[in-house]
């Protein structure tokens, strides 16, 4: 509003900050939609569940257990993926606690201990799991009623990871997307039909 603009050190910076804030909120909404729609069971062809013990059909030993073998498991999943789809999985999406468990797994640490840095990174994990890239979901969201008091608002807000932090998604995403190229999913924008940038966002200024 006019008071905030009058108190700003630079009007140009204020416009930029406002645009960045609104854009981030829109992208956050897109992340929320993706997580609630796709980063869950019942959507993809194969669902596996990590268990603490007594592994049965469709289950595996949780990766925070030193007796588990995520490297062999991913190799098997990759083979199954190629057999069922004709394409090699190249993208692995991990929850925040999943990446922590994998980085501290003794088998993985043993495999990379003679590398240049001896530190488990997402690049090294990608090589071990034979994928091109690993994406980690660290986004968080706050939930709670809006309260017109900073202290009460903070006390009444609960923060959590947007994604299931103990989940993983192995999928195929092409480097050159198109309507005729299969992929785990697409988000298209209709260029020339609606104004906006590549994310389908456009900016408009108005007085408040």
Placement of each model-derived feature along the sequence:
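Short, surface-exposed beta-edge/turn micro-motifs
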Residues: 88-91, 166-168
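Sequence/fold signature of self-assembling virion shell proteins
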Residues: 14, 56-69, 109-208
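A structural signal for short, well-ordered beta-strand segments and their strand-loop junctions
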Residues: 91-95, 135-137
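Alpha-helical scaffold segments that mediate packing/assembly in large oligomeric complexes
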Residues: 2-88, 96-111
């Amino acid at each position: 509003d006019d008071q905030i603009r009058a108190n700003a050190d630079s009007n140009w910076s204020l416009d930029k900050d406002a645009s960045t804030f609104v854009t981030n909120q829109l992208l956050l909404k897109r992340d929320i939609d993706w997580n609630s729609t796709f980063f869950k069971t019942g959507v993809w062809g194969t669902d596996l569940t990590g268990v603490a013990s007594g592994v049965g059909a469709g289950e595996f030993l949780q990766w925070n257990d030193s007796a588990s073998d995520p490297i062999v498991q991913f190799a098997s999943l990759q083979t199954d993926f190629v057999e069922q789809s004709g394409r090699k999985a190249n993208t692995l999406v991990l929850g925040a606690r999943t990446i922590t468990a994998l980085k501290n797994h003794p088998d993985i640490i043993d495999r990379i201990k003679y590398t240049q840095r001896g530190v488990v990174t997402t690049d090294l994990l990608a090589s071990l799991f034979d994928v091109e890239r690993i994406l980690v979901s660290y986004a968080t969201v706050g939930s709670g009623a809006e309260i017109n008091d900073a202290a009460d608002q903070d006390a009444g807000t609960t923060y959590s990871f947007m994604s299931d932090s103990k989940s993983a998604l192995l999928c195929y995403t092409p480097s050159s997307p198109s309507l005729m190229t299969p992929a785990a999913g697409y988000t298209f924008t209709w260029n020339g039909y609606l104004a906006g940038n590549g994310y389908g966002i456009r900016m408009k200024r108005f007085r408040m």
